[in-house]
A protein has these predicted regions:
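Short hydrophobic-aromatic micro-motifs
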Residues: 23-26, 95-96, 142-145
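Acidic loop->beta-strand submotif enriched in PP2C/PPM serine/threonine phosphatases
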Residues: 7-19, 79-81, 113-156, 190-194
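Catalytic core of PPM/PP2C metal-dependent serine/threonine phosphatase domains
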Residues: 38-108, 186-195
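Juxtacatalytic helix/coil linker segments
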Residues: 1-27, 32-33
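Active-site-proximal, acidic helix/loop segment immediately C-terminal to a metal-coordinating Asp/Glu
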Residues: 33-54, 136, 140-192, 208-209
């Protein structure tokens, strides 16, 4: 959803398959709002996916992307990077963040959070994105959001409210859950929103082949 529910969103997202049974979910928030921010965030995702498909390790791909943003232009532009890499064979997920909002993992009886204190891509030349690995099980849901989602909720209660929304719904379809969360945030928070808002949800299920 774009700022004011009308403008073009500066957020971009993508889900794609990588060799070796890996699946990526990437969410990027470009600086500011509107078309320029959208181009910036879309470019970050496109380049990261190309580097990963070419076989570069994720840390190397992020470093190259950051260098391109820092050195490639005179005007200051930066984008957050929130990436989840799912190993479809082991159930492990690597969460890599640069300036991104928390990720919420919905378990059977609790919500876990993945945080980042790393700066966004394009701010400093030497950047090491933060990485956390978690083992996921069937039924888990991974909820990724841009900061506009949290900023729309009452100050000091953002994460608590989102926890309650995620935990309190029986919705298991990722697409439906993403739409539900956006709708509830608009109901409970600032409407129209003062920043772009994006929710990206991935569900984990065991599939047995006979």
């Amino acid at each position: 959803i774009g700022k004011d529910c009308q403008s073009i969103s500066g957020d971009s997202f993508s889900m794609s398959r990588l060799p070796g049974g890996m699946e990526t979910a990437i969410l990027s928030d470009g600086m500011g709002t509107g078309e320029e921010a959208r181009r910036e965030s879309a470019m970050v995702i496109e380049m990261l996916e190309e580097l990963l498909r070419a076989g570069f390790p994720v840390e190397t791909a992020i470093s190259m992307m950051n260098t391109a943003l820092v050195m490639g232009r005179e005007d200051v532009m930066f984008s957050t990077m929130d990436m989840s890499i799912f190993d479809l064979y082991t159930g492990k997920c690597k969460f890599i963040k640069a300036g991104a909002a928390p990720t919420f993992i919905k378990r059977a009886e609790k919500i876990e959070h993945i945080y980042s204190e790393c700066l966004p891509l394009g701010v400093v030349q030497s950047l090491k994105a933060e990485c956390v690995t978690k083992e996921l099980v069937s039924g888990d849901m991974v909820v990724m959001v841009t900061d506009g989602v949290l900023d729309a909720l009452p100050a000091g209660e953002q994460e608590k409210i989102l926890d309650l929304l995620i935990q309190g719904t029986p919705i298991e379809n990722p697409n439906e859950l993403a739409h539900y969360l956006l709708e509830k945030v608009l109901e409970l928070g600032k409407n129209p929103p003062e920043d772009d808002m994006t929710v990206l949800v991935a569900g984990i299920w065991n599939i047995c082949y006979n």
